[in-house]
């Protein structure tokens, strides 16, 4: 049993498993990407490596799905304009 777990873990490491996440896009000033239409957000999300993006109208912000882990999707401080 332990051998099977070891082999499975090694296969995952060797294949380069990539984790994906969903969230709002933030710029370098900790501000969300503002939007008015889905096309803009789709373009921005894809440029960051995401699968899909849309304008979440309630917050007027771009929401992305399938982003790489390295992309900032959480606010880390105050938005400075």
UniProtKB/Swiss-Prot annotation:
Per the record, its GO cellular-component terms are: extracellular region
Membrane-spanning ranges: none
Domain LCN-type CS-alpha/beta: where?
Answer: 21-80
* Gene Ontology molecular function, alphabetical: sodium channel inhibitor activity; toxin activity
Any signal peptide, and if so, which residues? 1-19
Read off the PROSITE patterns from this record: LCN_CSAB (PS51863)
Highest taxon of the lineage: Eukaryota
The alphabetical list of record keywords is: Disulfide bond, Ion channel impairing toxin, Neurotoxin, Secreted, Signal, Toxin, Voltage-gated sodium channel impairing toxin
Is Signal a UniProt keyword of this protein? yes
Query: Where is the protein localized?
Result: Secreted
Cystine pairs annotated here are 31-79, 35-55, 41-62, 45-64
Q: What is its main location?
A: secreted
Q: Which InterPro entries match?
A: LCN-type_CS_alpha_beta_dom, Scorpion_toxin-like, Scorpion_toxin-like_sf, Scorpion_toxinL, Scorpion_toxinL/defensin
Family membership, please give it.
Answer: Belongs to the long (4 C-C) scorpion toxin superfamily. Sodium channel inhibitor family. Alpha subfamily.
Mind telling me what this protein is named?
Neurotoxin LmNaTx15.1
Origin organism of this chain? Lychas mucronatus
Q: What is the lineage of its organism?
A: Eukaryota, Metazoa, Ecdysozoa, Arthropoda, Chelicerata
């Amino acid at each position: 049993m332990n051998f099977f777990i070891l082999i499975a873990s090694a296969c995952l490491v060797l294949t380069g498993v990539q984790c994906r996440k969903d969230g709002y896009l933030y710029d370098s000033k900790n501000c969300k990407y503002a939007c008015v239409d889905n096309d803009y957000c789709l373009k921005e999300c894809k440029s960051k490596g995401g699968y899909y993006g849309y304008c979440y109208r309630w917050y007027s912000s771009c929401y992305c799905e399938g982003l790489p882990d390295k992309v900032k999707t959480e606010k880390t401080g105050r938005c400075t304009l």
